[in-house]
Amino acid sequence: MRTAGERLPSMLDLRVICKRYVTQSFTQVALDSVSLSFRDNEFVAILGPSGSGKTTMLNVIGGLDHFDSGDLLIDGISTKDFSDRDWDAYRNNRIGFVFQSYNLIPHQSILENVELALTLTGVGHAERRQRARKALEAVGLGEHVDKRPNQLSGGQMQRVAIARALINDPEIVLADEPTGALDSTTSVQVMDLLKDVARDRLVIMVTHNPELAYQYATRIVSLADGKVTDDSDPFDATEAARREAKPTRKTSMSFVTALGLSARNLMTKKGRTAMTAFAGSIGIIGIAAILALSNGVNGYIKNGRGGHALKLPAYDFQTRLRPVVHDGRTGGYR
């Protein structure tokens, strides 16, 4: 049992995080001793000018970038010794990403785009399809499941990206400028959706739009020069209770799924596939010809022109005067 003064862990805890990008002649401090704790269901907006460290902090939280010093705690567990597999499991099981650029595959339907997020979880095809439909219905796109991204508006594509982020039921949704490429009306629609998402999970959003941030977010964190300059609602350690850790799921993709995705990609880009196959064939034929020629020459030399004496000029290096002829058949000199 915990004592009254014992600190209870938050869901996500950044402790004195530092991150620097070093070049040959310059060092950029992206995060300078950042300490923040997040609740498990709040809508946090990260504000600050360009270069203040907003996106870097989001990448560190999402495991896309690693901190140089400090620590990131998840349910009180340090990530200092996380392996690549641990980070993969963390991103796959607990994080949903929403980016400004949508990152949708153009030759697949939006249903297939959303479904793709489950291919590494070992979920069967029928269940993947069902959950993808449900996620698209939740964002108001249930009637557009067979359309491709180029048949949708910018706001609709961002909704697809949000559905893809939610299909794996993540505990944390990270949104990097989700309204940056949208008009004001569509931005409000996306913000309404994110606010609804934040009712039962943590949403951390980076934005340059303070009006939307103050209107929708439950907490505003301001950054400048890699430091936290303001926090409207800091986490209070005494308000939290220990959360039950969510079991991790093994990351895997079935052979049939991998084969199907590969075949779809090859058939979509037939011209490039044909050119690649043609170039590869030429390379293989060239290597085979070189090996055959090399073996033929070696055999020719070894057999001494079909059994005849192979005479190679040599010199007596002791006198350096008299030429000596080597008899390849007898092994002697004359």
Task: Specify the residue positions occupied by each region the protein language model found.
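Helix-to-loop junction immediately C-terminal to a conserved catalytic motif
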Residues: 62
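Conserved ABC ATPase "signature" region
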Residues: 77-78, 115, 119-122, 126-143
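Short coil-to-helix segment of the ABC ATPase nucleotide-binding domain corresponding to the Q-loop/switch region
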Residues: 108-116
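Conserved signature/switch motifs of ABC ATPase nucleotide-binding domains
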Residues: 147-150, 167-168, 199
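Conserved ABC ATPase signature
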Residues: 148-158
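Conserved catalytic loops of ABC-family nucleotide-binding domains
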Residues: 193-205
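N-terminal Sec/SRP start-transfer signal
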Residues: 246-282
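Alpha-helical transmembrane segments
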Residues: 285-319
